Amino acid sequence: MKAFFKTILASTIGVIVGLTFMGIIGLLALVGLVAGLTSTPTYVPSNNTVLRIDLNGTIADNPAEDPLALLWKEDETTLSLKEILKAIKVAGEDPRINGIYLRAGNLDGGSASLQSIRRALEAFKESGKFVVAYGDNYTQGCYYLCSVADRLFLNPQGMVMLNGLSSQTMFFTGLMEKLGVEMEVFKVGSYKGAVEPFLLKKLSDENREQIQSYISTIWGHLVEGIASSRRMSTDAVEQFANEGLAFAGAQKAIDMGLIDEQKYQPEVDRFIREQTGQENKQSYASVSEVASLDTPKGSGPKIALLYAEGEIVPRQSVSGYDLSQVITERLADQLIELKEDKEIKAVVLRINSPGGSFQVADQIWRQVEELKKEKPIVISMGDAAASGGYYIACAANRIIAESNTLTGSIGVFSLLTRLADKLGIGSDVVKTNPYADLGNSMRPMSADERALLQHQTEYAYRTFLSRCADGRSMTTEQVDRVAQGRVWTGSQAVDLGLVDDLGGLQQAISDAAELAQLDHYQIKEITTNKSLFEELFATTGPTIKANLLRSFLGDDFIYYQTLQQMRVNSGIQARLPYDIRPL
């Protein structure tokens, strides 16, 4: 019997050791596979190469690299704005690259991001090289971007979907009533409409006014850009949209001056070969290949480029079901590190955020203020830098925005939920102090409790006004007149004193160099992207769950995200009253 147990024990240990060994071998093989998939060999372009930019996917400032996406074979593509701009710049300077081919697709991009790419393409054309665009169809944002091309081609059965801008707000009040959930709301700002979806069944007059104002301003910029590039009147562009001519066929788009010719894709390829003098096969280069040619040159003082993209949330509130990037207190830590780094002479902080947690925004604001005492910091605003995003920005030496950036929204709110009696759920409480169960969702709030929370919200708003007034050299009264939670475009914000100048990331870098009195400098990009091992071990589960939800919900996933954000974002919020959908 003793020998039998020895045999069993030895066999068990052998199995455990064997499985452990096989697991380690399997893990190393997986790491090697992913590393091989993500490694990029050195790219050397041949003469007469054309940079091909596939406008298909979602544009993000600095998307986190996800090597696991290659294994999951995810269809959704995230396009790096940083990489696209770098590739266009390199293509203009490299004599081996003759032109750019814009391949229109299903592009999701904010209007400010599209402005940045459009400006880069216009600068590229000054090199004398060509830009050609083709689409089976052109979405509105994609056409705005491609309209800068020398020649625009459209599939004979295609459409230019230039119809105008709209804004849709989802209201959950009816759903809350059916579920027996009531909302306790505390806010400051006539235009702070973030709470309206949970209180009203349609837009308030103030919210409707601000939305109409900013979408009309952005539409005006789009129309002017298209008209200028296509050498047509703004009235003609408006006519195309107003009369629904997107549905009149490709020939109508040609007649109106929006498109040059109808062509199928092989004919466009042949046209490009004629431009480059290639008889048989055209050599194309991808964005990542051309961007890889931009290697740092020389040495010297450094300007740090730091990205702040996504919702502002406490670290512990990050949801595993949310695939979007977020801003946490980690950004404050990075600003401290940059302040103490003697090699860094200036900082450019790129903000693309609708805002979020007031407390986290205040912590980051503090470190912007502290860094400014040691070295200049310039803000570059992306598609949105509003509410908490603007809170962070207001302390900087200088703020640069695109004309279509959504910013401002200086206001705060907080939401508490209460389960209504009709659910049939009751509770009883024993407490030591009057406010020990403040925020209890099982009972109505007392007048005293409401007064306390409204006072806290108003205090946060006064703090917000004070931060902006100090940072922008204005009085709190002046800030209050343009605050009240109202959203402004970048061009409006310049007129109001909330932004210094209009421009893109490159202008912000140039301004930082000027403030630091640097003639020669290097750019040091500060990244928070996860390492391969972090991707493999830390986020696999949440990512799979999020992808399953996205696959199941489809386009409605964004509404789930909105409700999820409201759930995890406790406390006072400094956030845009809605999410920004791409053009």
What are these regions (language model features)?
Residues 1-2, 78:
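Short, membrane-interfacial amphipathic segments enriched in basic
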Residues 3-40, 48:
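Hydrophobic alpha-helical transmembrane signal-anchor segments
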Residues 40-50, 298-299:
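Membrane-proximal juxtamembrane linkers immediately C-terminal to transmembrane helices
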Residues 46, 148-149, 179, 257-258, ...:
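Short, structured coil segments at secondary-structure junctions
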Residues 51-170, 297-422:
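Cleft-lining beta-strand/loop regions that shape enzyme active-site pockets
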Residues 173-271, 420-502, 506-516:
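Charged, glycine-interspersed solvent-exposed loop segments at helix/strand-loop junctions
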Residues 228-229, 260-302, 413, 423, ...:
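C-terminal long alpha-helix characteristic of the crotonase
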Residues 300-343, 456, 527-583:
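Intrinsic disorder and flexible/low-complexity segments
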